Amino acid sequence: MNEAYSPAAPRPMGSTSPSTMKMFMCFLSVFMVVQTIGTVLFCLYLHMKMDKMEEVLSLNEDYIFLRKVQKCQTGEDQKSTLLDCEKVLKGFQDLQCKDRTASEELPKFEMHRGHEHPHLKSRNETSVAEEKRQPIATHLAGVKSNTTVRVLKWMTTSYAPTSSLISYHEGKLKVEKAGLYYIYSQVSFCTKAAASAPFTLYIYLYLPMEEDRLLMKGLDTHSTSTALCELQSIREGGVFELRQGDMVFVNVTDSTAVNVNPGNTYFGMFKL
């Protein structure tokens, strides 16, 4: 009995497993990252190497030029060389002239600035010392007031000292640098027979956040039998420790009686 022949079915080709593909992709990624890093490092190394080679070549060119100059000056093997000694020596002389001109211009420039280059440090120290020696002081003259005021007003005069470290604000003197200060004031005033209470001069330390502090006080009681004004003066002065930003001012019992003729009424301070 004949049986029909049927060929065997082809075996299916084996497919690549997902884990193998994943490992291959990871390996490829790592390889590319390593290659990129290596390329960057190699480029950096090559750049540094080229910079170093440029320095070496520059030094080599200088050496060759000096060697040419030496040969031309000593006459060494002039017949066996193809050097144009006249051209080489002229170039060397030009370089010397440029260097000499630059070295001469530098002292002139420094001389124009006051010989600073040899004594720059000492001059700076001298300037600082002179700044420190400049007095910190101010002296003000009185200003007439026709109404009663709590704080006497003042003005600068052409003959009196002023300092940027002592500023004036509406009758008050403000110190910009802490330290010991001598504070003084004189007030001249007129008394009449009708006046019975003493005329009092006050010098206060201004305290914005609390009550003003009395530094000095002067009194004068002078009776007169005439109705005319008789001129009197009260003067106060003392040394006080002031902080940066402290302000002082002058007050009197009757500001309308103050005489502000030149030299009669003044207010000032200076740092010790």
UniProtKB/Swiss-Prot annotation:
It is a single-pass type II membrane protein. Glycans are attached at residues 124, 146, 251. InterPro entries: CD40L, TNF_CS, TNF_dom, Tumour_necrosis_fac-like_dom. Its main location: membrane. One of its GO terms (biological process) is positive regulation of extrinsic apoptotic signaling pathway. GO terms for cellular component: cell surface; extracellular space; plasma membrane. It is found in: Cell membrane; Cell surface. PROSITE patterns: THD_1 (PS00251), THD_2 (PS50049). Residues 136-272 form the THD domain. The soluble form derives from the membrane form by proteolytic processing. It comes from the Eukaryota. The keyword Cell membrane applies. One of its GO terms (molecular function) is CD40 receptor binding. The record marks 110-111 as: Cleavage. Residues 1-23 are cytoplasmic. Belongs to the tumor necrosis factor family. PANTHER family: CD40 LIGAND, TUMOR NECROSIS FACTOR FAMILY MEMBER. Homotrimer. Interacts with CD28. CD40 ligand, soluble form: Exists as either a monomer or a homotrimer. Forms a ternary complex between CD40 and integrins for CD40-CD40LG signaling. This is CD40 ligand. It comes from Gallus gallus. The gene is CD40LG.
